[in-house]
Amino acid sequence: MTENQNPEQKARDNIDALLMQAGWAVQSAKKIDLNVGAGQAVREYQTDVGPADYVLFVDKKAVGVIEAKREEEGQRLTAHEPQTEGYAAARLKWVNNKAPLPFLYESTGIITRFTDARDPKPRSREVFCFHRPETLKEWLTQSASLRARLQHIPPLNLNHVPDKELR
């Protein structure tokens, strides 16, 4: 990083470092190689609504999008969720994506929020780091997201609970 960077460039440098720590190969949209590493984070990937800051690929399939914001936007990060959702729903160039991308992030490089769009009522939550490509790959093999599976937990059978536990 140099002193002459604007806040957006500094945020992207921080995001690049966080992605690399999580096992992502960070690439420019001008030089994409989907065979490098377990997952690729492609900067400025073209969509039909404009370039997304980052599109995440696992096994050569687009699985997520990251909307980068300058650090000063940290307290308003949730206000940018509709923009991220727009990129996730957009048609990607060079990729035949029929459904919206399931994994959405907004990040300043300091604060990162994550939404699993497969949840019954998707909402973002703050995370400490980006998920690893292997984690997203595993989640995609599951029939439903964790929050969706939690909705199908059987009710507690009170006949098997001791009386003193019910007080």
Describe the predicted segments one by one.
Residues M1-R167:
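ATP-dependent helicase/translocase motor core
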